[in-house]
């Protein structure tokens, strides 16, 4: 589910050279029976994960940067936070289809929506009857787990009924890039360019090399009998070690950035001598809650 991650370190720094630098494999595949798009489908089983790269000698102290994928500047939520509570039992009351415990793992989430409004939600992950093992990490001694970061849009559609479900999990577009387990392993779109690195404000960062790679499950959605959507990771590869690759590297042209950086602040801290504009380009004398532009940056007043 959202926030689960795997972190790896190569036995050498991965250089940032021309073109894609990494290939990260998942187990995505296309549907052979998409009831809506048929053979033209870009759907199947794709469970996108966000990639972060770390610079430093120690995984606990290194500086992390997100690789901005195709949805970063449009539909990604950048401040999603969720807390999961350790289940009190492995079986319990259940009335939902495919469930062996309806109120299995409690969760509480919060985020800022596109209008700058703070949202929150709470609920439970049910335990799928097909999976008897505990969903909770057995090595975790605490009562809660909290994850924070980017969250990608949901990508699953059920074309069946509640009793006979037919889930298709789509790529965001034919040229969507920047996410693990979101294309075939043989596609160019399963490769990643360190040049896509951005800091916490969404500003481009020039990195000569990276030491760590982290893949984080980027969606928060439940798909009936399939359960929660979870990124699958099956391998990492430094492309520059492939013979002849640097002579003809994979080039993925990133989506055009909005040129805006995100700064979250309270409206009472609005600078009186600065000009603020709404998203229609109109000057605003006194910003209230919402999203504004100041000096080329996106300002979210809460």
Task: Describe each model-derived feature in a short phrase.
Residues 254-280:
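Residue-level detector of functionally pivotal "anchor" positions at catalytic/ligand-binding pockets or at interdomain
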Residues 1-47, 69-256:
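A domain-level signal for the mature, folded cores of soluble proteins
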Residues 50-52, 275:
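Beta-strand signatures of extracellular beta-sandwich domains
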Residues 55-59:
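Short loop/turn segments immediately following beta-strands, especially the blade-tip
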Residues 284-288:
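Surface-exposed, flexible coil segments in extracellular/virion-facing regions
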Residues 60-67:
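Tryptophan-centered short beta-strand motifs
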Residues 291-302:
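C-terminal tail/sorting-segment detector
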């Amino acid at each position: 589910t959202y926030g689960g991650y795997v972190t790896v370190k190569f036995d050498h720094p991965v250089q940032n050279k021309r073109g894609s630098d990494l290939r990260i494999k998942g187990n995505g595949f296309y549907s052979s029976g998409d009831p809506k798009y048929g053979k033209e489908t870009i759907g199947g089983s794709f469970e996108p994960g966000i990639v972060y790269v770390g610079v430093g000698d120690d995984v606990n102290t290194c500086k992390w940067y997100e690789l901005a994928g195709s949805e970063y500047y449009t539909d990604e939520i950048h401040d999603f936070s969720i807390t999961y509570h350790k289940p009190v039992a492995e079986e319990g009351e259940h009335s939902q289809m495919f469930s062996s415990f309806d109120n299995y793992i409690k969760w509480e989430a919060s985020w800022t929506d596109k209008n700058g409004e703070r949202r929150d939600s709470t609920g439970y992950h049910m335990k799928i009857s097909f999976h008897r093992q505990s969903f909770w990490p057995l090595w975790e001694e605490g009562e809660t787990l909290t994850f924070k970061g980017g969250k990608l849009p949901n990508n699953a559609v059920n074309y069946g009924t509640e009793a006979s479900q037919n889930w298709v999990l789509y790529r965001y577009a034919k040229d969507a890039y920047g996410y693990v387990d979101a294309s075939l392993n043989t596609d160019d779109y399963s490769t990643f360019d360190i040049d896509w690195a951005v800091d916490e404000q969404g500003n481009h960062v020039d990195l000569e090399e990276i030491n760590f790679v982290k893949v984080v499950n980027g969606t928060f959605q439940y798909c009936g009998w399939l359960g929660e959507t979870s990124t699958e990771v099956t391998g990492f590869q430094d492309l520059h070690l492939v013979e002849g690759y640097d002579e003809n590297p994979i080039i993925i042209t990133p989506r055009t950035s909005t040129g805006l950086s995100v700064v979250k602040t309270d409206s009472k801290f609005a600078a009186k001598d600065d000009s603020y504009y709404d998203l229609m380009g109109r000057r605003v004398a006194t910003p209230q809650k919402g999203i504004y532009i100041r000096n080329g940056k996106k300002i979210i007043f809460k």
